[in-house]
Amino acid sequence: MMRTPKILLFLFISCLCFGCQSSLRRESRIEKQDDVYVLSFANLSFSVSAGKGGRIVSFKCEDRELLTSDSVHSKYYGATFWLSPQSEYWPQYQCVDELPYQAEIDKQILRLVSPPDSISGVSVTKEFSISERDSSILIHYSVRNVSRQLKRLAPWDVTRVYGGLSFFPVGETDRMNKSDVTGGYEDKGMVWVPCPDGTNERGQKLLSTAYGGWMAH
């Protein structure tokens, strides 16, 4: 009997906006607005659309939106989970990225499950909650093989944001480390990628090892 391979991805999104630590209500809650579930805590608001592939459609701090909306691009907006490598999983399966997910709330955890799909052979589960200890958003993605074939894939977290400065601690030297991103540079153990609004007129990629398990924008 074939074992069901499972891939787990833990993501911690911390809001770095000044002023988020406030005297407002210090209890997290989950509210449903049509097919969108809104997780909120203090000055944070985090919205996930069950009807749009379990996509993260909004992340706000002090009412300031950090993710791009469908007004920027009708298809590629917000934040989502993809399968990789792109050479084998493109375009993304609709059941993973676009079709409705089944939603349930377990205490203070929002759980979304994609329907088992015979074409992709996978089912994706997404869990979202808020850590009241440090105001971070806890995201847990898992992929289940529902086919009878071996699956080789890796998780790919995709986040679309407005222009700004992205940075992360660089890891070890690797032959895969390469970039054609305009303006990116390495300094003091960090990779810095300035991306002003309106300046990216072509597709660009930066491939790099990382250290510390975080990236900030």
Regions from the PLM with identified roles:
Residues 24-28, 85-136, 148, 152-153, ...:
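Extended, loop-rich substrate-binding clefts of extracytoplasmic carbohydrate-active enzymes
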Residues 44-46, 51-58, 64-65, 135, ...:
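A contiguous, surface-exposed recognition patch within enzymatic or periplasmic domains that forms
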Residues 12, 16-29:
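Bacterial Sec-dependent signal peptides at the C-terminal "C-region" and cleavage site
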Residues 36-98:
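Acidic-aromatic substrate-binding/catalytic surfaces of carbohydrate-active enzymes
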Residues 1-8:
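Bacterial N-terminal signal peptides that target proteins for export
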